Amino acid sequence: LILLLTGCAMKSTQIKTVDKVDIDRFMGDWYVLAHIPSYVEKNAFNAVESYKLNEDGSIAKTFTFNEGSLDGPVKTYHPKGFVIPGTNNAIWGMQFIWPIKAQYKIVYLDKDYKITIVARDKLDYVWLMARSKTLPHDQMIKFRNMIEGMGYSLDNYREIEQE
């Protein structure tokens, strides 16, 4: 009963994804510039997510960052992604621990595939990523406001320093 009540009390929404993702163009390195982090990445610096399309259609992700500071110990994780059929490649299940697949929704993607926002309906985590290590301040504010407009609380929103 407690789990049921807790689940009902969690904030959730249906965040709209982009219409379509060209999966091949999305592959490669993305610098995480800001996020509402999961526990694992709450002290991340130099965070980079790298995606590679496997022959079976799954996505090999390598998530690397320095823990605690720009020169902190390097942490690396290798979750596996699965595109959800019928979503035009815009919704994935990201598997860190078998058999659980966490929702991963591509909710913003510029036409040049240089900036993206990945979010979740639970409004618990979000990632602003770019192909470059920095964005101009006005763009960072624009995307922060966009994330807030999706319904996210910005209490734990954090920009990630990149070296």
PLM feature spans:
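A beta-rich soluble binding module of mature secreted/lumenal proteins
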Residues: 8-163
